[in-house]
Amino acid sequence: MYGTTILSIRKDKSVIVIGDGQVSLGHTVIKSGAKKVRRLSSDSVIAGFAGATADAFTLFERLESKLDKHPGQLMRACVELAKDWRMDKYLRKLEAMMIVADKSISLVITGTGDVLEPEDGIAAIGSGGNFALSAAKALIDIKGISIEEIAKKAMKIAADICVYTNHNVVVEKIEG
């Protein structure tokens, strides 16, 4: 998936999801301040997306609906979304990935039906995802650095390297 970087970090009972604001069409920057990270389910869930914007909004709506059916059960809601995404003829064509997190779990959801929980609490998607992921993993064990500092530094590194990622970030956090 091209066009963005979304990073999620879980540390010391807190979780943060951060994403850049660049929207690209081919090789052209269309918008630099898009909000690809938002809160769902009465602000108890944070979700970020990479991929086609219209597809992501469709998935946000579907996830919100699943969360309404299964309140407080993020894993179940995500598995139900992934099932629909994989089986529905229309949804199968959507080109996006999502990171979702609540106070207890972080998940990556893909269009191939995967619902993955990162074993170390760090996940990233999008064109700059591997850069942000590597930087966050390198910074996570440094004493005295906050989860916000790790996330912002990792995103800065990703934006410095990835042409589809910019420095305008949106940060959402859930305290443990």
From Swiss-Prot:
Documented activity regulation: Allosterically activated by HslU binding.
Keywords, sorted A to Z: Allosteric enzyme, Cytoplasm, Hydrolase, Metal-binding, Protease, Sodium, Threonine protease
Reaction equations catalysed: ATP-dependent cleavage of peptide bonds with broad specificity
Source domain of life: Bacteria
GO cellular component, one term: proteasome core complex
SUPFAM superfamilies for the chain: N-terminal nucleophile aminohydrolases (Ntn hydrolases)
Binding site for Na(+): A159, C162, T165
Active site: T4
GO function term, MF aspect, one: metal ion binding
Localization in the cell: Cytoplasm
EC number: 3.4.25.2
Keyword set includes Protease: yes
UniProt cross-references to HAMAP family, sorted A to Z: HslV
Family from the record: Belongs to the peptidase T1B family. HslV subfamily.
Function: Protease subunit of a proteasome-like degradation complex believed to be a general protein degrading machinery.
Name assigned to this protein: ATP-dependent protease subunit HslV
Encoding gene (name): hslV
